[in-house]
């Protein structure tokens, strides 16, 4: 009861308004020593006896309140997690002691039918806690700053900078002696802060996306209404509705249900599922509903569940490196080693030339502090060359591009769960998609019905009268009983009193059809008792219910795929409601009706019944023969707007769309033709036929398969496995059911449906399509291609900078004995190249041209011949320009005077930076001449370019003391900008040069252009 005591003390204890009695007695004694007159004395002190009496009355009142609250809230109290332990420890004895599940329900003030009162939520959360797990605190911004400081090359540079400051102060005094070192320190600080800000913003973005992943909703009964709430709002006492594919959101006890099978492998590690019943009612959070449905009462939430304790111990390990990041890390390592060699050679050349000059002038035995400063600066330059050469911006660019794409896709209703999925989707060559809800709207209505050998089109106003005119009341009664008893949908009342049907789209359509007929509220239906329920799943393709009739007999109702149910029937209901034998001619007519419905793109479902003996085994499965056919439903599910254009886009992008559905083959073919998936050369096949093929037959068949109907989840898995294994395809697969999990896991990219998908399917997927729309899947592919191409653009840009910076400093060191680009200047270039360059180029949005080329195949080179052509061409131009300025600048520009060398070095630095600025613009298009297309709409790119130019002006004109530059006149500025802008002309010339034959040469940007393709995309 300690927790209740704390709760009552916190909320209902009445603190004394005046000081404590002991303090008042001390005050009385003090007053007594000063005020001798007793009458006057007691004006200054209270009557303690009366006060004690008043306090006694207050205590008495409080005790009464406590007793009342104990009595009132005793129904909500269990000592020391006792309620949670009953479920987590599977304590049957304790459960029995409390009166079973019914007793627990009463003790937590809940009702199986009405649930809890919403007004109790705060009280329940205060006592039992909230349904959230303890999460590790997010990393602060300063932790990212610390991480950025851990770069070894920056640490070495910092040491060099401090040495430079120390030696400079000793030789040149304050403040001139510290300029060089302080310039390096400020540059390091700037690099660290920009890196930290970038990483911190990305972490916030990924955390936001992670929070989106955790948004899970569940159906509960509260205040007598069934409603949908977030799992985080669950409290003890809630009545939760579970169905196939759900992840159990809290610990609870089974109330009632049908064939509930729970997968506890996530907690126990046991692969065998557990049957849950009233004899074994314990259901644990984190487990998954493998089959069946049920209602449970919540007994523990959040950190009081075993799942909560387990989740709180798991640290966020972050994302694994994506395949592209791994590949680029290899590239970065090679470039870094080359940079290290150049840095060592540059330092050795500078040192040797310095020693030779010193030996020839003052001798090697005389050393001054200025000599030490020179060597320190040489070493700093060498280390900075390593900083520039090591392209740590490559993995950063990938992460930045993926994060940007993920954010945009989130706005487009696609939640990317794994980073690698986004880039992999850009290489997808096949999309295996479901039909229902993905290609179609998933808003279903009964459009036609066949009953007693009569087909009728359904209209809400006339169908009741039309059916009454062609069938007897007994036939109609059987139809309605089959609809209302054999359904997983439910009619609920909203707050405004209106009725709403909850359930899957198919179940809703049939139940709404039944509600539109007369006789809905007949007492006969409510008098029936459900004995056994077999929920629908994608393997059986049917659902069944066994009911006990008021007459004492029992009856099975079965509903499902038309061909399967028809095979189970040997009788049919005639117009008078009698069961008559089903002749072969009638069976053929029924099949023709099914095919006719399917050819109109209608989903077909059959409803049948079977009378059974009263002594049937309740645990036996539903029979597979001897049924009597009642009706066939033709359900309309229109194709989504935009799907046909999306499929056309896929074709022009070299992506094959294959429909894999459990529907009738004629329905599937009709929808596939309407969407543009099924072509004249395409193959439509049924799952059983596909599964019977040999590997050799599959090898010939699979490339042409465009539609697979009546397929099982295993058939989808087999198709995906063979596409990846036999044809080395990058395959993406959509799925919504629990049984789709193996195919989603096997595919390169698993796409789960956010609306129709189960939690099991979502957990197995890489991307969750929040609106279940096929067009959204194409957007994922577009952004995947954009990520790949954007990284190629950045690599092209960065390698150009690397080559020029390394060569120009090395050649200058060899010939002149000095490096024109100082450590501070190289650090600024490094920031332009790594962080700002990645930000500018990695965030380019996709364009339509990307979807007019086939995808990159596995094993293709990341750096294409087109990229090498651009890199080498731009590098040669920049080396020529900078070399001309270095060796002939003074004479060519007629620069004379004591500061001529400083002006030339500043001009070299300024021209070098502007070459990178214009080459960054050049890199927006690797093959197209027009590099300005769409640049106005990309504000990030414009902002980066503007910031680079603005800061370059500040460095040259105002920070010369730190950056070793001098102010330039307007002619020199014009020259620098002009030399940089010529990079655009060089880019145009380079793009006119063919790059040779071969596979790569025919694949600009890594993609092979299609010979033909629609232009209106």
Curated annotation (Swiss-Prot):
Q: Per UniProt, where does Mg(2+) bind? A: 736, 740
Q: Where are the transmembrane segments?
A: 154-174, 177-197, 229-249, 331-351, 385-405, 803-823, 826-846, 875-895, 939-959, 973-993
Topology term for the membrane: Multi-pass membrane protein
Q: Which InterPro entries match?
A: ATPase_P-typ_cation-transptr_C (IPR006068), ATPase_P-typ_cation-transptr_N (IPR004014), ATPase_P-typ_cyto_dom_N (IPR023299), ATPase_P-typ_P_site (IPR018303), ATPase_P-typ_TM_dom_sf (IPR023298), ATPase_P-typ_transduc_dom_A_sf (IPR008250), Ca_ATPase_N_dom (IPR024750), HAD-like_sf (IPR036412)
Q: Name one GO molecular function term.
A: calmodulin binding
Q: Which reaction does it catalyse?
A: Ca(2+)(in) + ATP + H2O = Ca(2+)(out) + ADP + phosphate + H(+)
State the EC number(s): 7.2.2.10
UniProt keyword terms in alphabetical order:
ATP-binding, Calcium, Calcium transport, Calmodulin-binding, Ion transport, Magnesium, Membrane, Metal-binding, Nucleotide-binding, Phosphoprotein, Translocase, Transmembrane, Transmembrane helix, Transport
Broad class of where this protein is predominantly found: membrane
Which SUPFAM superfamilies does the UniProt record give?
Answer: Calcium ATPase, transduction domain A (SSF81653), Calcium ATPase, transmembrane domain M (SSF81665), HAD-like (SSF56784), Metal cation-transporting ATPase, ATP-binding domain N (SSF81660)
Q: Where is the active site?
A: 434 (4-aspartylphosphate intermediate)
The record's annotation in Pfam families points to: CaATP_NAI, Cation_ATPase, Cation_ATPase_C, Cation_ATPase_N, E1-E2_ATPase, Hydrolase
Q: Which PANTHER family does this one have? A: CALCIUM-TRANSPORTING ATPASE 11, PLASMA MEMBRANE-TYPE-RELATED (PTHR24093:SF462), CATION TRANSPORTING ATPASE (PTHR24093)
Q: What does UniProt say about this protein's domains?
A: The N-terminus contains an autoinhibitory calmodulin-binding domain, which binds calmodulin in a calcium-dependent fashion.
Job description of the protein:
This magnesium-dependent enzyme catalyzes the hydrolysis of ATP coupled with the translocation of calcium from the cytosol out of the cell, into the endoplasmic reticulum, or into organelles.
User: What's the protein here called?
Assistant: Probable calcium-transporting ATPase 8, plasma membrane-type
Q: Which organism is it from?
A: Oryza sativa subsp. japonica
């Amino acid at each position: 009861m300690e927790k209740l005591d704390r709760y009552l003390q916190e909320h209902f204890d009445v603190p004394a308004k005046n000081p404590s009695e002991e303090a008042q007695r001390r005050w009385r004694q003090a007053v007594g020593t000063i005020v001798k007159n007793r009458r006057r004395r007691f004006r200054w002190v209270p009557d303690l006896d009366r006060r004690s009496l008043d306090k006694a009355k207050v205590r008495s009142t409080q005790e009464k309140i406590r007793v009342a609250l104990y009595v009132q809230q005793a129904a909500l109290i269990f000592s020391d997690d006792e309620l949670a332990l009953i479920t987590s420890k599977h304590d049957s004895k304790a459960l029995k002691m409390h009166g079973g599940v019914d007793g627990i329900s009463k003790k937590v003030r809940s009702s199986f039918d009405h649930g809890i009162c919403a007004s109790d939520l705060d009280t329940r959360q205060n006592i039992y806690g909230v349904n959230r797990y303890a999460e590790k605190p997010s990393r602060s911004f300063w932790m990212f700053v610390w991480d950025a400081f851990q770069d070894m090359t920056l640490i070495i540079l910092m040491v060099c900078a401090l040495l430079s400051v120390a030696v400079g102060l000793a030789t040149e005094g304050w403040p001139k002696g510290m300029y060089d070192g302080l310039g390096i320190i400020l540059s390091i600080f700037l690099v660290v802060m920009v890196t930290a800000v970038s990483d911190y913003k990305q972490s916030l973005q990924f955390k936001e996306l992670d929070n989106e992943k955790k948004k899970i909703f569940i159906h509960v009964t509260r205040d007598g209404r069934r409603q949908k709430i977030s799992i985080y709002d669950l409290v003890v006492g809630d009545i939760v509705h579970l169905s196939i594919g759900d992840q159990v959101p809290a610990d609870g006890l089974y109330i009632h249900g049908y064939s509930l099978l729970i997968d506890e492998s996530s907690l126990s590690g046991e692969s065998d599922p557990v049957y849950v019943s009233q004899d074994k009612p314990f259901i644990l959070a984190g487990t998954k509903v493998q089959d069946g449905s049920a209602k449970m009462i919540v007994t523990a939430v959040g950190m009081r569940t075993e799942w909560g304790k387990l989740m709180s111990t798991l640290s966020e390990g972050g994302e694994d490196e994506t395949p592209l990041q791994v590949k680029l890390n290899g590239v970065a390592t090679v470039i870094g080693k080359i940079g290290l060699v150049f840095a060592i050679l540059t330092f050795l050349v500078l040192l040797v030339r310095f020693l030779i000059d010193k030996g020839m002038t003052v001798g090697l035995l005389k050393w001054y502090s200025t000599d030490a400063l020179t060597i320190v600066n040489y070493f700093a330059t060498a280390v900075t060359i390593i900083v520039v050469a090591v392209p740590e911006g490559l993995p950063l660019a990938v992460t930045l591009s993926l994060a940007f794409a993920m954010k945009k896709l989130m706005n487009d209703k696609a939640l990317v769960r794994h980073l690698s999925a986004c880039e992999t989707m850009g290489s997808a060559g096949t999309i295996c998609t479901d039909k229902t809800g993905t290609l179609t709207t998933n808003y279903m209505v009964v459009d036609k019905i066949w009953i007693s050998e009569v087909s009728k089109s359904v209209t809400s106003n006339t169908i009741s009268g039309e059916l009454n005119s062609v069938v007897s009341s007994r036939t109609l009664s059987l139809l309605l009983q089959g609809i209302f008893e054999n359904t997983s949908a439910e009619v609920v009342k909203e707050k405004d009193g209106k009725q709403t049907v909850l359930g899957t789209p198919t179940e809703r359509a049939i139940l709404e059809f039944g509600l539109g007929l007369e006789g809905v509220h007949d007492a006969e239906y409510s008098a029936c008792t459900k004995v056994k329920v077999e929920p629908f799943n994608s393997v059986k393709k049917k659902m069944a219910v066994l009911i006990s009739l008021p007459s004492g007999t029992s009856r099975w109702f079965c509903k499902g795929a038309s061909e399967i149910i028809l095979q189970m029937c040997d009788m049919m209901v005639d117009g008078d409601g009698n069961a008559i034998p089903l002749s072969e001619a009638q069976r053929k007519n029924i099949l023709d009706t099914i095919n006719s419905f399917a050819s109109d793109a209608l989903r077909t479902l059959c409803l049948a019944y079977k009378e059974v003996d009263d002594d049937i085994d309740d645990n036996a499965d539903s029979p597979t023969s001897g049924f009597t056919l009642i009706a066939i439903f033709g359900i309309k599910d229109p194709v989504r707007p935009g799907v046909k254009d999306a499929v056309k886009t896929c074709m022009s992008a070299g992506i094959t769309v294959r429909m894999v559905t459990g529907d009738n083959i004629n329905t599937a073919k009709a929808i596939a033709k309407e969407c543009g998936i099924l072509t004249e050369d395409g193959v439509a096949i049924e799952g059983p036929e596909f599964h019977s093929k040999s590997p050799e037959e599959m090898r010939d068949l699979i490339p042409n398969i465009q539609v697979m109907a009546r397929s099982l989840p295993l058939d989808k898995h087999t198709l995906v496995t063979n596409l990846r294994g036999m044809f080395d395809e990058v395959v993406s697969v959509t799925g919504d059911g629990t049984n789709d999990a193996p195919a989603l896991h096997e595919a390169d990219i698993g796409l789960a449906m956010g609306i129709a998908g189960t939690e099991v399917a979502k957990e197995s997927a890489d991307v969750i399509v929040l609106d279940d729309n096929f067009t959204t899947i194409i957007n994922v592919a577009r952004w995947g291609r954009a990520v790949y191409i954007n990284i190629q653009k950045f690599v092209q840009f960065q390698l150009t900078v690397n080559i020029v910076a390394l060569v120009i400093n090395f050649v200058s060191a060899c010939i002149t004995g000095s490096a024109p680009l100082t450590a501070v200047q190289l650090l600024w270039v490094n920031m332009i190249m790594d962080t700002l360059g990645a930000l500018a180029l990695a965030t380019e949005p996709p364009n339509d041209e990307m979807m007019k080329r086939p995808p990159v195949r596995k094993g293709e080179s990341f750096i294409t011949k087109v990229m090498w052509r651009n890199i080498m061409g731009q590098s040669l131009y920049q080396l020529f320009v900078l070399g001309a300025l270095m060796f002939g600048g003074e004479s060519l520009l007629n620069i004379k005077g004591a500061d001529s060398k400083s002006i030339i070095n500043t001009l070299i630095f300024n021209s070098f930076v502007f070459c990178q600025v214009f080459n960054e613009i050049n890199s927006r298009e690797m093959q197209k001449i027009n590099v300005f297309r769409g640049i106005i709409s990309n504000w990030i790119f414009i902002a980066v370019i503007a910031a680079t130019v603005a800061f370059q002006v500040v460095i040259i004109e105002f920070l010369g003391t730190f950056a070793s530059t001098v102010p330039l006149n307007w002619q020199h500025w014009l020259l620098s900008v002009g030399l940089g802008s010529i990079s655009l002309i060089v880019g145009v010339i380079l793009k006119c040069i063919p790059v040779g034959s071969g596979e790569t040469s025919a694949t600009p940007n890594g993609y092979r252009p299609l010979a033909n393709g629609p232009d209106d995309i």
